[in-house]
């Protein structure tokens, strides 16, 4: 939730990084309160992107909305699994549910296999959502330059998309990690 997201004040982050983290936090809150366009949160693993995306989902669910949250590699695995004769889910149903969700959160874009099939499916999702102007949240650890050019062009449209890079290091490790009390 937004309430348990740590702005990490005890870690003595630089003022620039602290302000950046607060700015991204406010952008995520604003998106949750007024979902429109696309919100992209980029940064290293463990910097808080997925936490903020999940906080958006929780807030929206609390307001009665039904956002769809998917981890991109898992989504592609689920789509592939629908081709199995034993699958109880239809490919079209799953794909259309994601493409046309009133609010979609795509977590970990760029960590999926870059097969031609995966690139095409992701492009179709992005293109549908772009053309329909559907609110979308995207988290990614990589660079925009590493994405399919067709997806990147939609993400770089500043009329639709706000891109924020979280400068904070991972909270999971390194010298800025807060000390934890050992349990007995």
Task: Show where each model-derived region lies.
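Walker A/P-loop nucleotide-binding motif
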Residues: 35-53
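Pre-Walker A (pre-P-loop) alpha-helix and adjacent loop at the N terminus of AAA/AAA+ ATPase modules
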Residues: 4-39
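Conserved alpha-helical scaffold flanking the Walker A/P-loop in AAA+ ATPase domains
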Residues: 28-32, 78-104, 120-128, 150-151
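P-loop NTPase Walker A phosphate-binding motif
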Residues: 51-65
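Loop/turn-to-beta-strand initiation segments
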Residues: 37, 65-66, 100-103, 132-138
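Short glycine-rich substrate-engagement loop in P-loop NTPases that contacts/grips substrate
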Residues: 14-22, 61-100
